[in-house]
């Protein structure tokens, strides 16, 4: 059985296999999403026992089939304890990768954005701009991101200095007011310019709602209309812990 070269990776999800093992879904730098069999990982003294989401790992595996065997998993940094909202945000980005990417389809640029998202999630809890950036970069890497630079009907471009609102329609792109389609989401021109750019700085808080709605609708098209479990859990958590009037606001920041 061939041992593959090592790779940097993050755990997206794992579930039991047999009495002592785990099936682990990894997001790796060179292979993209990779499923591996972690033999004996459920034993308390196993070297693989600390595998969990949110930990950067250096991994090696044996074999090239659909489910190679995990041979080594070394921690590359400390695991930072996350609060419930941070955990739900981590679950959210991991669920997007699990639902929308295929195994062994590498996305090195997206891997870097994923790591930047985890860093921001730990250092800026409660802010949602890095999730919007991840969503947009995911769509771009998968070839699904619509053109945000021009009106899909007339070709006019949004002006960041303008207070004008544009219209966003999932799977079709953006439209100026003169060509507004039905069932579209209003979004600030400056927010569109930010969304199609590098997105290295925070978005304006006033954009949170429109950015979230636009990207949520776009993602739902590719999720086959089947909602994400992480969104359901976020709403349930906020209903238990926050007054009803703050739920929408916290959703806009956290997802």
From Swiss-Prot:
<comment type="similarity">
    <text>Belongs to the RecO family.</text>
</comment>
<dbReference type="InterPro" id="IPR022572">
    <property type="entry name" value="DNA_rep/recomb_RecO_N"/>
</dbReference>
<protein>
    <recommendedName>
        <fullName>DNA repair protein RecO</fullName>
    </recommendedName>
</protein>
<keyword id="KW-0227">DNA damage</keyword>
<dbReference type="InterPro" id="IPR037278">
    <property type="entry name" value="ARFGAP/RecO"/>
</dbReference>
<dbReference type="InterPro" id="IPR012340">
    <property type="entry name" value="NA-bd_OB-fold"/>
</dbReference>
<dbReference type="GO" id="GO:0006302">
    <property type="term" value="P:double-strand break repair"/>
</dbReference>
<dbReference type="GO" id="GO:0006310">
    <property type="term" value="P:DNA recombination"/>
</dbReference>
<keyword id="KW-0233">DNA recombination</keyword>
<keyword id="KW-0234">DNA repair</keyword>
<dbReference type="InterPro" id="IPR042242">
    <property type="entry name" value="RecO_C"/>
</dbReference>
<dbReference type="GO" id="GO:0043590">
    <property type="term" value="C:bacterial nucleoid"/>
</dbReference>
<dbReference type="Pfam" id="PF11967">
    <property type="entry name" value="RecO_N"/>
</dbReference>
<dbReference type="Pfam" id="PF02565">
    <property type="entry name" value="RecO_C"/>
</dbReference>
<comment type="function">
    <text>Involved in DNA repair and RecF pathway recombination.</text>
</comment>
<dbReference type="InterPro" id="IPR003717">
    <property type="entry name" value="RecO"/>
</dbReference>
């Amino acid at each position: 059985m061939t041992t593959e070269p090592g790779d940097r990776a993050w755990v997206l999800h794992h579930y039991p296999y047999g009495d002592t093992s785990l099936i682990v879904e990894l997001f790796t730098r060179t292979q993209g999403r990779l499923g591996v069999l972690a033999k004996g990982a459920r034993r308390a003294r196993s070297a693989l026992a600390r595998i969990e989401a949110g930990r950067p790992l250096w991994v090696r595996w044996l074999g090239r089939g659909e489910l190679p065997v995990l041979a080594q998993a070394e921690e590359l940094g400390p695991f930072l304890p996350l609060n419930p909202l941070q955990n739900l945000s981590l679950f959210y980005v991991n669920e997007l990768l699990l639902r929308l990417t295929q195994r062994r389809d590498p996305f090195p640029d997206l891997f870097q954005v994923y790591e930047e998202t985890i860093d921001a999630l730990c250092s800026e809890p409660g802010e949602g701009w890095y999730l919007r950036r991840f969503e947009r970069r995911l769509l771009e890497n998968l070839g699904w991101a619509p053109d945000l630079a021009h009106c899909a009907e007339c070709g006019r471009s949004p002006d960041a200095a303008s207070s004008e609102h544009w219209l966003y329609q999932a799977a079709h792109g953006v439209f100026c007011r003169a060509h507004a389609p039905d069932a579209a989401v209003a979004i600030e021109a400056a927010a569109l310019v930010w969304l199609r750019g590098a997105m290295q700085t925070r978005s304006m808080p006033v954009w949170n709602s429109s950015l979230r709605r636009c990207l949520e609708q776009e993602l739902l098209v590719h999720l086959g209309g089947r909602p994400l479990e992480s969104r359901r859990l976020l709403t349930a958590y906020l209903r238990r812990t926050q007054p009803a009037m703050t739920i929408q606001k916290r959703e806009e920041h956290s997802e």
